[in-house]
């Protein structure tokens, strides 16, 4: 479906700097652990029907911090998405309030097949659930089912300097093929929509990869700018509660599995957009296909196997994959594999992948076979998201001076 990537990684990021980059760099140098627990809370959805602004309670220890993440509806999730993002998201469910979004609006900013978008959306949702996301703990929904995403994006666009968007490397890279003049406005404003996805739900944390920090930097800058332009005393004079309109989201950086590399190039990330399917393991690949891909994957001619050798990126990547899917410690893998040849290790890795992915594939088939069950989950997730987003939108419209509809 065009540019396939996980929204939790917030796409391809560059080293562009904004005015508060120094403070963010210090923040990112000490990333929040995925397993931490917290006592303060994010906003709740109570009272969202009223016309007044909604106050937040940041002191109760009984409400979890909120994490928002998502993925584009490619319909085909690969191992990099799973190990780098989804597997970690599953681990977040017990510690945080979690919202997982199928971001179909993002999928249409580049050419795509209209006949496949809907199916890809449900297939991706089914894969989310098959990977272990528990709807009793987390909300799963489709971005376009919650119109507030686009509403908030427009409000944010009005406060985002063009120069900030021009620095985003994603637009430069994605528009290169068609030429800047032929690229869509949607592609250019893509970062504002991603920021809306985060800020709409007053996210406390956003899962991002080590190499993908530019978007969370932009989201923080936009949140701070809007708070300055419309929050505080200005908002209070319009009848609001004053204070900040948005929380400033913080990055949540996975400590393992955050960067799974291509099977054909150990220096490039595993990606759906890579032209060769041989470069990735898809979660729904058959057993025979997994064996074949691992058998043919790029290796090297060094003796033995080892982690963390800059001259052996493929070796480090394959050992890291094996470590994660086998559930073993790094030291255990080093001891087990240090004297192995590639001919011995590759079947071991293929078997570990098959064993790890087989339950996911079986669960996926069960979910896809029950479309009404999936529809109900996505509808309930959207209801919860709308409830949360309504608080933010009501406050934003009030703070920006809009005349709001009165319901009779």
Swiss-Prot record:
Molecular-function GO terms, alphabetical: ATP binding; tryptophan-tRNA ligase activity
Motif interval(s): 'KMSKS' region: 269-273
Gene Ontology BP annotations: post-embryonic development; reproductive structure development; tryptophanyl-tRNA aminoacylation
Chain span(s) of sequence motif 'HIGH' region: 73-81
Subcellular location: Plastid, Chloroplast; Mitochondrion
Annotated PROSITE patterns: AA_TRNA_LIGASE_I (PS00178)
Database matches in SUPFAM superfamilies: Nucleotidylyl transferase
Transit peptide interval: 1-52
UniProt entry tagged with the keyword Mitochondrion: yes
EC number of this enzyme: 6.1.1.2
Domain of life of the native organism: Eukaryota
Entry binding sites for ATP: 72, 78-81, 209-211, 260, 269-273
Predominant location category: plastid
PTM sites of type N-acetylserine: 53
GO annotations of cellular component type: chloroplast; mitochondrion
Binding site for L-tryptophan: 197
Disruption phenotype: Lethal. In heterozygous plants, aborted ovules.
InterPro entries: aa-tRNA-synth_I_CS (IPR001412), aa-tRNA-synth_Ic (IPR002305), Rossmann-like_a/b/a_fold (IPR014729), Trp-tRNA-ligase (IPR002306), Trp-tRNA-ligase_bac-type (IPR024109), Trp-tRNA_synthetase (IPR050203)
Family matches, as PANTHER family: TRYPTOPHAN--TRNA LIGASE, MITOCHONDRIAL
Name of the protein in its database record: Tryptophan--tRNA ligase, chloroplastic/mitochondrial
């Amino acid at each position: 479906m065009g540019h396939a990537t996980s929204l939790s990684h917030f796409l391809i990021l560059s080293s562009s700097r904004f005015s508060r980059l120094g403070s963010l760099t210090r923040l990112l140098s000490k990333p929040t652990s995925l397993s931490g627990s917290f006592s303060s809370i994010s906003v709740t959805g109570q009272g969202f029907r009223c016309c007044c602004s909604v106050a937040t309670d940041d002191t109760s220890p009984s409400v979890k911090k909120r994490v928002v993440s998502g993925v584009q509806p490619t319909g085909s999730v690969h191992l990099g998405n799973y190990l780098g993002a989804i597997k970690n998201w599953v681990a977040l469910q017990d510690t945080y309030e979690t919202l997982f979004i199928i971001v179909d609006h993002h999928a249409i900013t580049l050419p795509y097949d209209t006949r496949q978008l809907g199916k890809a959306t449900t297939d991706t949702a089914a894969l989310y659930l098959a990977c272990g996301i528990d709807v009793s703990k987390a909300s799963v929904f489709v971005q376009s089912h919650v119109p507030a995403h686009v509403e908030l994006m427009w409000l944010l666009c009005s406060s985002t300097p063009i120069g900030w968007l021009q620095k985003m490397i994603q637009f430069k890279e994605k528009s290169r093929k068609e030429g800047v003049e032929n690229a869509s406005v949607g592609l250019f404003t893509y970062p504002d929509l991603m920021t809306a996805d985060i800020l709409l739900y007053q996210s406390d944390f956003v899962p991002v990869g080590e190499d993908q920090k530019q978007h969370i930097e932009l989201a923080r800058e936009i949140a701070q700018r809007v708070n300055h332009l419309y929050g505080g005393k200005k908002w209070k004079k319009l009848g609001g509660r004053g204070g900040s309109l948005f929380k400033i989201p913080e990055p949540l950086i996975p400590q393992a599995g955050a960067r799974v590399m291509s099977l054909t190039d150990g220096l490039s990330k595993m990606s759906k957009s890579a032209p060769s399917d041989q470069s990735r393991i898809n979660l729904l690949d058959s057993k025979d296909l997994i064996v074949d891909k691992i058998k043919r994957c790029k290796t090297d001619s060094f003796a033995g196997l080892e982690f963390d050798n800059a001259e052996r990126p493929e070796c480090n990547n394959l050992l890291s994959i094996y470590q994660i899917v086998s559930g073993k410690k790094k030291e255990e893998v080093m001891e087990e594999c240090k004297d192995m040849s590639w001919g011995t290790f590759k079947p071991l890795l293929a078997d570990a992948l098959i064993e790890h992915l087989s339950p996911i594939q079986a669960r996926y088939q069960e979910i896809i076979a029950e479309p009404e069950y999936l529809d109900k989950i996505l509808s309930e997730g959207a209801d919860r998201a709308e409830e949360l987003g309504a608080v933010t939108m009501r406050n934003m419209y009030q703070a920006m001076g809009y005349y709001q509809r009165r319901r009779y």
